[in-house]
Design a protein with these regions (language model features):
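Glycine-rich phosphate-binding loops of nucleotide-dependent enzymes
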Residues: 2-232
Length: 232
């Protein structure tokens, strides 16, 4: 049984249909990449899984349980957390207060405040600062740490590298490797094809709200990926 399964998933913003019959599975312990151009439906898929966008109850299952009709906080309690695009930290709160918010769902596990600070030492040094005082890379670390504080079985990461310098992106993805080593299952949305394939075991390429290509990440023909990415 897959940890996450989407069957015929459709998603709408009002009358606009953003996803068309998405079939996607994530096995326990995998790292899945979702790639595609802007507007392909990648973020919409993550929002549907995380409960931020309503969809049919039977269209998404987590560990065999339908979750499409659940609220976002119910889904977090089941073990799904999301690192949203743009970080979405609370600017009036300190770094540590932002992190502690992630633990309010009450799930037990390896990820504690001390463990997050071990993963991101610079957050420990800046724990008393307001989130707005952090650099973009540090804010991304705080957003990841906040999600980890809920001790998720499945971590959804939306555009981790967006707007960050290459050296910062490298450090962020090195930390993602440490999270994977802890046994966390990941779904990573990323526009950088090379980075997405290097970080994942399998990938799905979205194009205009549909799955255009799905395959193992290692050794797949890059020309075929590029064609699916741009709809050529």
């Amino acid at each position: 049984m897959s940890l996450l399964r989407a069957r015929g998933l459709r998603a709408f913003y009002g009358d606009f249909q953003a996803l068309f019959d998405i079939d996607l599975r994530v096995e326990d312990g995998e790292t899945i990449a979702i790639i595609g151009a802007n507007g392909a439906g990648k973020t919409t898929f993550l929002r549907s899984v995380a409960g931020a966008l309503a969809c049919g109850n039977a269209m998404i299952e987590f560990d065999g349980r339908p979750i499409g009709a659940l609220t976002a906080h119910e889904i977090v309690r089941l073990g799904i957390a999301m690192v949203p695009e743009g970080r979405k930290l609370f600017p009036s709160l300190t770094v540590e207060e932002n992190l502690l918010l992630g633990g309010y769902c009450g799930r037990s596990g390896a990820w504690t405040l001390a463990r997050v600070y071990e993963l991101f030492p610079m957050l420990a040094e800046r724990r008393a600062l307001q989130a707005t005082a952090l650099s973009g890379g540090q804010q991304q670390m705080a957003a990841i740490g906040r999600a980890l504080m809920s001790n998720p079985r499945l971590l959804l990461c939306d555009e981790l590298s967006l707007g960050l310098a290459p050296v910062v992106i490298r450090d962020i993805y090195a930390c993602i490797g440490a999270i994977i080593a802890e046994g966390t299952t990941l779904v990573i949305v990323e526009q950088d094809i090379t980075r997405a394939l290097d970080a994942s075991t399998r990938f799905y390429c979205f194009q205009e709200g549909r799955v255009a290509l799905a395959a193992a990440s290692r050794g797949f023909d890059r020309d075929a990926i590029t064609s699916a990415y741009f709809g050529l």
